[in-house]
């Protein structure tokens, strides 16, 4: 079934109004006189907890053994790790064994952990195997001038409308999606889906937002045909939910900065604007109603902020993880 985000916001509010415990008559009687729409069912086993660790999970070989042991023993249902099989690391070929090891370990509520691979589709990363000597912004043409908003050196915005870039992402054994499938991941986390908001990207392609929706849909169609049940988790990009192609393509969303953000100079604890949080929660509720589980990563370095984020996320039905900006190790703030 095709939905628009506006329809979903209304439908989820209608269902909540019919089921909710507010007093007063007013609109309550009118809502209850109609049969509320039923929430859709997610297309995959939804974890109760997850952790994201994007550094030092195999790319350094034996030096990362303790980190991998810690991930295997940690009581999380799902793990989001970098797909080192697509990196230039000398240990790239160990990725499948690492995924297998993590799969074999138990989660907090699942007998075996789910493992998702990190794939950046909106930026070119200079440490990936596809990056060639001599590449620089403008050469090749799809690598655009600009810096990563989070301050990570060597990451560049891309014109993702480029067939060459899209071929790097999926469609051949060496592509990012194909490697993730071959290495045994349960799915992928698509980062920088919001690449359509970058000024250099808009200058190169004024229809960047629609192009990204088509791009994600093409990735999902390809991946699910190659590995049925492969899960597509998309980063942020709530605006794309008004596009039915995108909404049908993604299985879940991961929203960053729901309660606390970070910057290039601050690892976390930047309180999100309350109006922004309220709007995010409304839109994310609609996505959950459409059968799209919502994950969230908030960036905090204090116990008080971590506890606040976990408590508020749980009350909103959001699967939360709190860590610092680097995501370089398991957080010391485990979910309660």
Locate predicted features.
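Intrinsically disordered, low-complexity N-terminal extensions of nucleic-acid-metabolism proteins
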Residues: 27-29
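Glycan-processing catalytic domains of CAZymes
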Residues: 31-336
């Amino acid at each position: 079934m095709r939905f628009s985000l506006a329809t979903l916001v209304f439908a989820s509010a209608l269902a909540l109004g019919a089921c909710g415990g507010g007093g007063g008559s007013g609109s309550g009687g009118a809502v209850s006189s109609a049969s509320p729409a039923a929430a859709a069912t997610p297309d995959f086993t939804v974890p109760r907890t997850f952790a994201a660790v994007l550094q030092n999970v195999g790319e350094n070989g034996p030096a990362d053994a303790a980190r991998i042991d810690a991930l295997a023993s940690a009581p999380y249902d799902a793990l989001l790790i970098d797909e080192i099989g697509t990196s230039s690391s000398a240990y790239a070929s160990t990725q499948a064994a690492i995924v297998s090891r993590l799969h074999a370990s138990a989660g907090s509520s699942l007998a075996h952990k789910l493992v998702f691979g990190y794939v950046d589709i909106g930026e070119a990363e200079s440490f990936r195997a596809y990056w060639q000597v001599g590449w620089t912004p403008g050469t090749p043409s799809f690598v655009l001038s600009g810096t990563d908003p989070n301050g990570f050196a060597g990451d560049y915005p891309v014109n993702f409308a480029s067939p060459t870039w899209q071929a790097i992402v999926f469609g051949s054994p060496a592509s990012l999606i194909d490697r993730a499938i071959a290495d045994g991941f349960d799915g992928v986390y698509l980062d920088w889906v919001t690449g359509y908001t970058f000024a250099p990207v808009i200058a190169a392609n004024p229809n960047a937002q629609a192009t990204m929706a088509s791009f994600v849909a093409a990735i999902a169609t390809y991946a699910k045909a190659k590995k049925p049940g492969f899960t597509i988790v998309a980063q942020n990009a709530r605006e794309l939910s008004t596009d039915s192609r995108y909404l049908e393509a993604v299985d879940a969303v991961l929203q960053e900065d729901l309660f606390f953000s970070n910057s290039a100079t601050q690892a976390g604890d930047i309180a999100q604007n309350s109006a922004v949080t309220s709007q995010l929660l409304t839109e994310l509720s609609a996505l959950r109603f459409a059968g799209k589980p919502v994950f969230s990563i908030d960036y905090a370095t204090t116990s008080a902020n971590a506890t606040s984020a976990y408590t508020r996320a749980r009350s909103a039905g959001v699967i939360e993880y709190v860590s610092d900006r680097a995501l370089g190790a398991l957080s010391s703030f485990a979910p309660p």
